[in-house]
Structures are given as structure tokens and as C-alpha cells.
């Protein structure tokens, strides 16, 4: 069992006893954690420990073998999204290669109910925040891997989420871009916002308020 002690008050995100098995192999066993407004949670652990699987479950993109996920006290029964104040930055980024960086963000914002003019302005503002203002009109297929990663982060930021779930959101970035992007991500966890990010980087984890380490404890029978 892996658990972090719960704080008092309503959690933005709560996982209760999550277990996950894939192809007969147990990936996660009884993981419990809660994240409150203003908190930054790092999910750490060695390769294959289940970091990506956990974030996928927290986002509602897969179904746990057992256990439940709650957002603002309401049980999650589908994919989490802007309707629940949630934004995702997952591996693969989910960008449309034949649209520009700005258009990818505009599509997401308009799907979330923003007016076209507001979406266009917000897209460019978000790209500027991660240092991609000059690339707003570049097709995604013309961008480097790091630029695509920052575009995905900008899209999530533009949604103004109360909960941002990010899987290795700076893995492809050079030191300067990494610093800028982390600053913007951590700004989500101010006021009522919360951030959950998986990372293999101990420096990133150390900047978070709490760490959920998926490395099994010695003698843990799973």
C-alpha cells in the first residue's frame, strides 16, 4: 500500500485505494493520495513504477482494477476535463500536427466554451508565457519536440484549470525553457489551484509541497 496522509478540508483531487493491473501484471497497488487547493504534488519513482499509469487513472483515461478517484468530492466516472476545472499534459501531447501552435490551443478553448476572439487572444498569451510567442503561427509538425511539449503546457495553462495533471512536462526541454515552464506550471497551484506532476527529476520534485514515491518500501508485499 502507498498512501500520503490526508489533510483536513475538501480535496481538489482524491484517490482512494487505487489498484491497476495490465496484461496480468500488477502496476499499482492500493495507492491513496489527496491534493488540496494550493498544493503541488510530485509523483516519483523508477521507470516502470506506475507514474504514468497513476496519472492516467487520475485523469479518468483508464479504469482502475479497484479504488476510486474524486474531484471536488464528486466521484470521477469519465475523462476529467475543463468542465471539472481540469487540464492535462500527458505523454504524446495530443496536438494536431497540421494546425499551428496557436490553433491547437484555440480549438481546446473553443471546445471549453470560449468565444473565438477570446480563444485567439488567450492562445497567443499562453504561448508567450512559455517562450513560444514567436512560434504561434508555426505548424506543430515544424516544431521541435521541446516546442511541442511547451505548446501542450501552454494549452493546459490557457484553460485556467483548478487542477493540472502533468506527466513529465519538462522532459524534452533545455534548462532555460525548463525553468520558464516550471514557473508557469507552479503558478497554477496558487489560490484555489492544484498541480500534480510526474517527474524523474529530484530537483523538480523538491520544489513541490509533497512527494508521492511509487517505489515499493522494503518488505512491501504489494
Task: Locate each region found by the language model.
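Catalytic Walker B motif of ABC-type/P-loop ATPase nucleotide-binding domains
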Residues: 164-167
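Conserved ABC ATPase "signature" region
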Residues: 117-135
